[in-house]
UniProtKB/Swiss-Prot annotation:
Bias-annotated ranges (Basic and acidic residues): 435-451
Organism: Dictyostelium discoideum
Entries under SUPFAM superfamilies matching the protein: C2 domain (Calcium/lipid-binding domain, CaLB), WW domain
Disruption of the gene: reported phenotype: Cells fail to complete the final step of cytokinesis and form multinucleated cells when grown on a solid surface. Null mutants show excessive accumulation of F-actin around the periphery of the ventral surface. When grown in suspension, mutants lacking dwwA complete cytokinesis normally. Mutants lacking the N-terminal C2 domain fail to localize to the cell cortex.
Task of the protein: Involved in regulation of actin cytoskeleton organization and cytokinesis.
GO-annotated molecular function: calmodulin binding; kinase binding; molecular adaptor activity
Gene coding for it: dwwA
UniProt record, GO biological process: actin filament organization; cell migration; mitotic cytokinesis; negative regulation of organ growth; regulation of DNA-templated transcription; regulation of hippo signaling
Pfam families: C2, WW
Name of the protein this chain belongs to: WW domain-containing protein A
Biased composition annotated in UniProt, kind: Low complexity: 380-418
Subunit structure: Interacts with calmodulin in the absence of Ca(2+).
PROSITE patterns, per database record: C2, WW_DOMAIN_1, WW_DOMAIN_2
């Protein structure tokens, strides 16, 4: 069954702005009540955000536990809303009534829950329904609420190489083998390449997407045979980031599982659903029990995600609640032997992170930074960040804002897509951009690969911005500046940071040159020593510094220069 929301109907010329509605597939079934009026005719009335209403048939409750089971009831519909960010202000309510032969029916009690909890929590519910804030019975039901969007899977490039023979090739691709798309035919080649192929468009939920696979079939058009196949599980490459781009390096095999060719595929996911329900578990009046987070980064219900650290009325704190929610499939928590802190290991893509996959971040667009090789995610972030930091240090006067933006984006990406290992703190990256040797870390063997101990990152993007600004100002004060505004603090002419000598006591300028240091210098010049013991020369007339010792001009030239200076 489907029902259109009348609020979505436009009035033609009166509508100036079109707002797209988010859609949810809702299914309600397995309703039952217990511990209520015994041997009574009971029926239920439901209201889903004033969008869809229902009423069950009347059944007689048992004489022992006062229970009624409505196995025959099941309802499906498509719910639409323009305000997905306000689901916590929308509610689903079930009222329990006792049918009377004479007079109006008796209201027994009701239960209500917000739609955000339904869209992010478990499917099963076993809760207390109340009347005047007093529990009068129990209500059981299952409610599936799947956020669906028109997902777009784009293929920026499909590159094949090392084919056995030169021929004409075509490749078709699909999601879950539904409506496969075909590429153009590349003739007389052993390395066919396709760029910007038609995108896969499918109205699907996040669960169906992540649990699905992308299939590729390579066809030799001369023989009209499929010579190679590839099944790419979405779970192995997907990250809960809008516009994320993955570069997959893998192999195509024939029916006998023999290698046919190498493949490099660039895939992008757009318009992904934002919400998904937990796997398994049940919701009760005491919270959620036995559930598993669907995927890293997917929002959690408020009953878990927004409970304060203090114990709740039923004695459960936020940490206690989280213990009843399992990590997503393929995730494991471990304790760092050095710091004693808990970190998280993702066996799906062999990465580590300090951030729990149960903590979600808002959907953000980002540039491609992750490469996947043989179903293993490789880290390109460190090299890119080091290059960016080197360039920023060489252009200090122009790139302050770029530094701030890059580091804030780096923090957001670290939360949304863990890397191996997590990036270094921003302050260390800026102060030491050319540092090649890193501190050796203890490594933890995890099956057939090694995972380095994660490194700590700033807590928030704002904290990272403060650190980068403070570091930039300190670095700028120490860099080369031709204009000397304070003669007491003259900066030597050095725009490249150099290592400090190992000696603890550096010789003074008088120990190096004796008493002849100021002799032989032109008028207005002075010799000084920097913090590393190096000698430089200060031109007070032009307000400049140099490493080169100035030479005394010929007396005639010196007199001419003096006259010119006096005229000025």
């Amino acid at each position: 069954m489907s029902n259109k929301n009348p609020l979505n109907n436009s009035n033609g010329s009166n509508s100036s702005t079109i707002v797209n509605s988010d859609k949810f597939l809702v299914k309600i079934h397995s309703l039952s009540v217990s511990h209520t009026s015994k041997s009574s005719n009971i029926y239920l009335v439901g209201d889903f955000d004033q969008f869809k209403q229902f009423k069950t048939e009347t059944k007689k409750s048992s004489s022992t536990h006062g229970s009624c089971i409505y196995n025959e009831f099941a309802m499906e519909f498509q719910y639409e809303t323009k305000y997905i960010h306000k689901l916590d202000h929308k509610h689903f309510k079930i009222c329990v009534y006792k049918k009377k032969s004479i007079g109006s029916d008796k209201y027994i009690g009701s239960f209500g829950v917000d739609l955000y909890t339904l869209a992010t929590g478990p499917i099963s519910h076993d809760v207390v329904f109340q009347k005047d804030n007093t529990g009068v019975g129990r209500l059981q039901f299952r409610l599936e609420m799947n956020h669906i969007t028109d997902i777009q899977i784009s293929f920026k490039s499909i590159l094949l190489s090392n084919l056995m023979k030169q021929s004409n090739y075509q490749i078709d691709y699909s999601l879950n083998k539904i409506n496969p798309l075909k590429s153009s035919i590349i003739e007389n080649t052993i390395c066919p390449s396709w760029y910007n192929q038609s995108s896969i468009l499918m109205n699907i939920s996040l669960k169906d997407l992540v649990d699905g696979s992308i299939f590729f079939n390579l066809k030799d058009t001369k023989s009209s045979k499929v010579i190679g196949e590839l099944k790419l599980p979405v779970k192995s490459i997907f990250s809960f980031v809008e516009g994320d781009i993955k570069i997959v390096k893998t192999l195509l095999y024939n029916e006998k599982q023999n290698k046919i060719c190498d493949a490099c595929i660039e895939i992008q996911f757009n318009n992904i659903p934002q919400l998904a329900q937990l796997r398994g578990g049940i919701q009760t009046e005491q919270g959620i029990r036995g559930a598993e987070s669907f995927f890293s980064g997917v929002p959690l219900p408020k009953i878990i995600g927004e409970i304060s650290n203090a114990s709740t009325s039923d004695g459960y704190s936020k940490e206690a609640q989280l213990q009843h929610v399992k990590l997503p499939d393929g995730w494991e928590s471990r304790i760092d032997p050095v710091s004693g802190k808990v970190f998280y290991l993702n066996h799906n893509n062999k990465t580590t992170s300090w951030i729990s996959p149960l903590e979600h971040a808002p959907v953000k667009k980002r540039t491609p930074t992750v490469v996947i090789s043989n179903t293993t995610i490789l880290d390109n972030n460190n090299n890119n960040n080091n290059n960016n930091n080197n360039n920023n240090n060489n252009n200090n006067n122009n790139n302050n804002n770029i530094n701030n933006t890059n580091n804030i984006q780096q923090k957001q990406q670290a939360q949304q897509q863990p890397v191996q290992p997590p990036p270094q703190p921003v302050q260390q990256q800026v102060q030491q951009p050319q540092q090649k040797e890193k501190e050796k870390e203890k490594e933890i063997n995890a099956e057939d690969y090694k995972i380095s101990r994660p490194k700590k990152t700033p807590a928030t993007p704002e904290e990272a911005a403060v650190i980068i600004q403070r570091t930039f100002r300190n670095h700028k004060k120490q860099s080369y500046n031709k204009t000397i505004r304070n003669s007491k603090t003259i900066i030597p002419p050095n725009n490249v940071q150099q290592q400090q000598p190992q000696q603890t006591e550096k010789p003074s300028i008088y120990q190096v040159f004796g008493q002849q240091i100021d002799q032989g210098l032109p008028n207005g010049w002075e010799v000084r020593q920097d913090q590393f013991g190096r000698v430089f020369y200060v031109d007070h007339i032009n307000r400049a510094t140099t490493w080169t010792r100035p030479t005394v001009k010929h007396p005639k030239q010196h007199q001419q220069a003096t006259l010119v200076q006096q005229r000025k």
